Amino acid sequence: MTTTTSVLHTSALTSLPLLARGKVRDNYAVGNDRLLMVASDRLSAFDVILGEPIPGKGALLTQMALFWFDKLGSICPNHLTGEAPESVVTAAEIPQVAGRSMLVKRLKPIPVEAVVRGYLAGSGWVEYQQSQSVCGVPLPAGLKNASKLPEPIFTPAAKAEVGEHDENISYEQVVKVVGPELAAQIKTLSIAIYETAAAFALTKGIIIADTKFEFGLDENGTLTLMDEVLTPDSSRYWPVEGYEAAFAAGQNPPSYDKQFVRDWLEAVRINGKPWDKTPPSPHLPPDVISKTAAKYQEAMARLTA
């Protein structure tokens, strides 16, 4: 596995035009048909970019995404070009991209987050308690926080601008945005990818509770998997050995993802008051940063063991 030792909060490539900075990735144009996606070490929680980077995070996210793109290639085409990211920047810029970047096809993005849930957690659990459904999908009575669902469900979200909250939407709303044929294709493909990945992860002692996919259309109109896939930033990763006890106690299972930081941010008090989830975020203490970095490393090590 390639890793970089330097910490990168924000890339600063001058040889390519910057198109956008997302919560984690900086995207640069390479001609008219490709993008260079640089995964920084930034961390976002509650749709706010935190001030402190997590050392090694960008490289780990990139290696994990490449691992899954390779494993899922038979199910769905992806946006990778197969070319080395280092080939499109100057020699001086290589340290900023090595091990943490992907050179990808430029696609027409679909403005829907394709979320699949195999377990009830996070915003899904909150919504279930109010309506016994998630995104309009009715669920059985009596489920608890972190319950395994009878079968995975497709619970899409509207893609938000940076700094805005993604909003859960119904399948019918997806149909309105992309049409019935493409909506059905996205739903079927998302569930198939999730089921394949979740079954594999389980053999490594990891529960993928839920995940978020992003798709685009290529020049031929082919639905193509893009952005990141099945990383701890886009998924809830739970180690199997901590799940049963937490579930029985009605608690969030221990996780390999950002939940650790989310829980700390929920508990922290600023002048005696909870953080209101708007910028600026509270400063993460060094032990939270190091524990978060260790969780990303452990997830990758376990998955690829």
From Swiss-Prot:
- Pathway assigned to this chain's UniProt record: Purine metabolism; IMP biosynthesis via de novo pathway; 5-amino-1-(5-phospho-D-ribosyl)imidazole-4-carboxamide from 5-amino-1-(5-phospho-D-ribosyl)imidazole-4-carboxylate: step 1/2
Whether Ligase counts among this entry's keywords is yes
The reaction(s) annotated as catalysed by this protein in its Swiss-Prot or TrEMBL entry are: 5-amino-1-(5-phospho-D-ribosyl)imidazole-4-carboxylate + L-aspartate + ATP = (2S)-2-[5-amino-1-(5-phospho-beta-D-ribosyl)imidazole-4-carboxamido]succinate + ADP + phosphate + 2 H(+)
What does the UniProt keyword field contain? ATP-binding, Ligase, Nucleotide-binding, Purine biosynthesis
Q: Name one GO biological process term.
A: 'de novo' IMP biosynthetic process
Q: What class of enzyme is it?
A: ligase
Concerning HAMAP family, the annotation shows: SAICAR_synth
Matching PANTHER family, A to Z?
A: PHOSPHORIBOSYLAMINOIMIDAZOLE-SUCCINOCARBOXAMIDE SYNTHASE
Similarity comment: family membership? Belongs to the SAICAR synthetase family.
User: What protein is this chain from?
Assistant: Phosphoribosylaminoimidazole-succinocarboxamide synthase
